[in-house]
Amino acid sequence: MDIKRAKQEIKDAIEAYLVKDECGKYMIPAIHQRPILLMGPPGIGKTQIMEQVARECGIGLVAYTITHHTRQSAVGLPFIQKKQYGGKEYSVTEYTMSEIIASVYDKMEVTGHKEGILFIDEINCVSETLAPTMLQFLQCKTFGNQKVPEGWIIVAAGNPPEYNKSVREFDVVTLDRIKKIDVEENFDVWKEYAYQVSVHPAVISYLDARRENFYRMETTVDGRMFATARGWEDLSRLIQVYERLGKKVDREVVHQYIQHWKIAKDFANYLELYVKYRKDYGIEKILEGTYGEDTLEKLKVAAFDEKLSVVNLLSGRLAGAFKDTYEMDRYVSALYEWLKKYRALIREVEKEGMSEELYASGGIIKTIYFRAKKEFEDQKKAEKLDRDGERCMAKVVDTLEGYWNYAKEEHLAGNEAFEQIRELFADETEKREEMIDHTMEMLEHAFEFLEKAFGESQEMVVFVTELNTNYYSIWFLKENDCGLYYKYNKGLLFDERHQEILKQMDEAEESMERGIR
């Protein structure tokens, strides 16, 4: 199955494992909570989905790459203990707590999560000395003489033998005690993820055109050559920073991430053309609606690959605008929720009678600011926020601090302070509306340009399909009406339905012919 389905399977299993009955006991006892084993090629996102699942389920996560550990750190260090058996004293070997189990308890203390995921990566690549320990871990849920705390689910990941020479096969006894999920690479699923994490548009469009290069693992006389999803994402981050610094990404740089020389050269050439077309066609001018007729004429006579590159350039630029608009909306909505709490606190204080501290300049907004700051710190400590969520909440806290400072400097309190802060918040909502309007104008200009250049062609289908793939464009189009999008999307859906009907008719005809024969 693909990584998206695997994530859902893991999430469903964890939710089932953590359901309790009316007595507060787990409905599936720990002994029957099978460890989950993810088996799949390296670099397809096994570790990332564990972070996402933990965050979405609101539980903790402790992750270890077991190949980085010795038997002593996994099991614990031995020490001699005196014990009485049958009236005689004996020296017995005991073990200190496993470093891994100790990390689980540390995580529980720091985050407050009593339930979570213990994720062990590369579990089938351990050394000979650790192999029996790993079997014991999967079968008995213990490291040495220490059990994994109740409420913590074991998830392990490994690579099939064809990807790693040091792989050890699990025996049937072990496999019969685990929930095994085989994961395969899938570009369409990765593409959805790529849009969400803002992978560089050149990487997405290149892989969309050359899907066979998304994941490749080959053994040659010169050694192993490979391209992985992890490599493409990390290369994307580098390209984005290099563009900001004005540095060039050539084939040598690409090969440092995509360690398949043929693919690295091919992508480097594609990236060079991508940058050239962005400059030659003036993508920003197209989206502003200020392009010249010469741009249209040039595109009309261009080769299909060049036309497709321009469509991808427009999609890529719009993808950034959609995400910026989404983040602005998320920030303003979060700020609005805190200002509602601010208004509620003012009413509560008025009803109960103001204290001197709250009556002082900016006293109430100061209270709201510190509450927001504490909630932000608690969420970070509990690892409940992803990178975008953390950035959004940090901006909200900074804005609330600015409101407090403003009220303090202007000696504002109570309703007077609220009215002034409400005006400041109106500026933020106005900025959001301006950003939405600007993004809509860009989208409409893109449609108008493509309409003039291609009409209802294959290029327009590609453009609309990209809009239907991107998480942020889907959100934007749900929240804001775009007539041109609905026009062409309706045509696309009709064509797809028409093709589906023709296919069904062909299948029915073939079935009838087989029946006659």
Task: Give the location of each predicted region.
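General structural signal for secondary-structure boundaries
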Residues: 2-9, 36, 171, 186-189, ...
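Extended hydrophobic/Leu-rich segments
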Residues: 6, 97-105, 299, 501, ...
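Charged/polar, solvent-exposed surface patches and flexible loops
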Residues: 8, 12, 16, 55, ...
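AAA+ P-loop NTPase catalytic core and its hallmark functional loops
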Residues: 1-212, 217
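Alpha-helical lid/collar subdomain of P-loop NTPases
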Residues: 196-359
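Terminal-proximal interaction/regulatory segments of ATP-powered molecular machines
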Residues: 300-517
